[in-house]
Amino acid sequence: MAKKNFAREDVLDKVITLFWQNGYAATSIQQITKATGLKPGSLYYEFESKEGLFQAALARYATFSIEAIHLSMANASSVNNAIKQMLNTLIEQSKSCDYCGCFLIKTQLELASQGNQLYQFASAQLTKIEHIYLDYLSEYYPQIQAKAYAAQLMTVIFGIRIYGYQAESATTQINTISALLPWLATLSKDDNS
């Protein structure tokens, strides 16, 4: 067997962008080989199929997203501030001319009618993210309340990621967050924002 001359992570980073922009169905093997510089045989040997490559890309994206949540929580003065900063970052990202939303949410939307393994995988990653928020919120609230707040937060995140495609939506999103997540303003005594 020939030694592979590529790094799996580099390939995944390239295809994350491609799949994220185009979606699963609209991305061809030709586009993938052009973006990665690899031949189809190398891709199939490493990932078994286009579906396997897509799932590996989703997993890498989810890992980055989860790491970003933990980093934000670790660097903020409170869970309140971390959540606010993350929501503001999502809104800022939506202002970009090359805005792509969330890869996991876009996958859910694209593949919802099929309910296939990729859809289920994306859903599982989003559930995992919700549980991470739940764990952090549970430090401040009783479990039942924290669970409701984590679900509310995910609903707002989904909304930001989708509504972000609307031009000039940042002010509307900020006002909506304040209306939908009033508990966020009272979570921390040291919040001055």
Give the predicted meaning of each segment.
Residues 106-109, 144-163, 176-183:
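Hydrophobic alpha-helical segments that form the core
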Residues 93, 113, 154-172, 183-191:
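Amphipathic C-terminal alpha-helical segment
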Residues 4, 10, 18-52, 56:
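Helix-turn-helix
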Residues 59-65:
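Short, basic, alpha-helical segments at the C-terminal edge of helix-turn-helix-like DNA-binding modules
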Residues 11-19, 90, 157:
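Short hydrophobic clusters on alpha-helical segments that form packing/core surfaces
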Residues 56, 70-96, 149-153:
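Hydrophobic alpha-helical connector segments
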